[in-house]
Design a protein with these regions (language model features):
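Conserved mid-domain beta->alpha element of the FAD-binding
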Residues: 146, 189-258
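Short glycine-enriched, charge-decorated loop/helix-capping segments at active-site entrances
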Residues: 15-19, 93, 216-217
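A general structural signal for well-ordered alpha-helical segments in protein cores
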Residues: 27, 101, 160-163, 260-261, ...
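Predominantly flavin-linked oxidoreductase catalytic cores and closely associated redox partners
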Residues: 33-176, 186-193, 207
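A conserved beta-strand/loop capping segment in the N-terminal third of enzymes
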Residues: 1-33, 54
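C-terminal helical "tail/cap" subdomain of flavin- and related membrane-associated enzymes
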Residues: 232-325
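A short, glycine/Asx- and small/polar-enriched loop/turn
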Residues: 4-5, 51-58, 72, 193-197, ...
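Flexible, glycine/charged-enriched surface loops at secondary-structure junctions
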Residues: 174-181, 240-243
């Protein structure tokens, strides 16, 4: 972690690891696995959901190869089409009201000779207002490639310039750029994931990306499994209320963590003075231990009560500005 004043805090992981996923490989692997399991795979762009005379859903999409519209009659629709989900916009109440952070990153070729500041076994997170006024910037290793990026909800902020500055600061200014990518990251789960009939959302479309960290892959996969169970129950029973179980199950498992992380982001990411204190606070062994235990197990750690008490008073000192920076 790097503070606004360039002070660095290492947060080693004890008893576990954080896996960095190559989405270009992983996403295709998931699609191929679904196909092997019996799914019919079609490539195209979702257009809309129509209704036939019986009221059943008719999904219409544009075929990628022919560019012609294709219609598919279906009993259920699962919208997993990202943070700006067109399925959510068309079919779900409140689906157009999703706050998000815009993320942009550049995939770089890992230099043959690594810069002094770069460690291929370490994720670097920059909490600096000049790189992101309300989120963070990052250098994430992916073996032969590196992800250098940043996120912000401020529309007037030049995120591309910020990533350029980040690369120069990390000694990666001359690294080869393989591709550039941008995508919205939802800030909180939608209030409704289903239309009460035959449409359900999951993943980024449902808003299940962790605040503060922006972690989404684990939560999307967990949400996908819960959504699949809800769809199966709905199909077997014919009761559309079963669709609500997906959101209820997810929020029961992860809602409290999301709430805490949301508070953390809204307070500590506000300005450089608070970011400086936040990074300093993360130097504390109690904070590091409980942070990693919560992160690795995806739940708030309830044991070690004295560690929580110590953190409470340390947090209070930082909140009141009594702790030295």
């Amino acid at each position: 972690m790097v503070s606004p004043s360039a002070k660095e805090v290492d947060m080693p992981i004890d008893g576990g690891y954080v896996g960095m996923v190559d989405r270009e490989v992983f996403d295709e692997w998931l699609r191929a696995r679904a196909e092997r399991s019996g799914a019919t795979r079609a490539r195209g762009t979702f257009l809309r959901i129509d209704r036939d005379a019986e009221g059943d859903a008719i999904v219409q999409f544009e075929d990628k190869d022919t560019h012609q519209p294709v219609k598919v009659r279906t009993r259920m629709v699962l919208g997993a089409d990202g943070a700006r989900s067109e399925v959510a916009r068309q079919a779900i109440e409140g689906g157009r009201e999703v706050p998000f952070v815009y993320a942009y990153h550049e995939i770089l070729r890992t230099p043959a000779t690594a810069p002094a500041k770069y460690d291929g076994s370490r994720c670097d997170v920059y909490y600096q207002g000049e790189l992101s006024p309300d989120f963070y910037a990052w250098i994430f290793p992916h073996g032969d490639t590196i992800s250098a990026g940043a996120g912000t909800a401020h529309k007037g902020f030049s995120i591309r310039n910020a990533v350029g500055a980040l690369r120069r600061s990390a000694g990666l200014g001359g690294a080869e750029v393989i591709r550039r990518e941008g995508a919205p990251i939802p800030l909180k789960p939608l209030r409704r994931w289903d239309n009460g009939r035959d449409v359900l959302l999951c993943g980024d479309a449902a808003g299940v990306v962790a605040p503060a960290s922006g972690e989404g892959i684990y939560y999307a996969m967990a949400c996908g499994r819960m959504s699949a169970r809800a769809l199966d129950r709905c199909l077997r029973t014919g009761n559309a209320h079963a669709l609500r179980a997906a959101r209820r199950e997810f929020m029961s498992a992860h809602g409290r963590v999301f709430w805490v992380l949301g508070l953390l982001q809204r307070f500590w990411y506000t300005n450089d003075k608070r970011r400086e204190r936040f990074v300093k606070m993360c130097r504390d062994p109690d904070v590091q231990r409980l942070t990693w235990e919560s992160y690795m197990h995806k739940r708030l750690v309830r044991r070690q009560p004295m560690a929580h008490v110590r953190i409470f008073f340390k947090d209070l000192a930082h909140l009141l500005g009594l702790a030295p920076t």
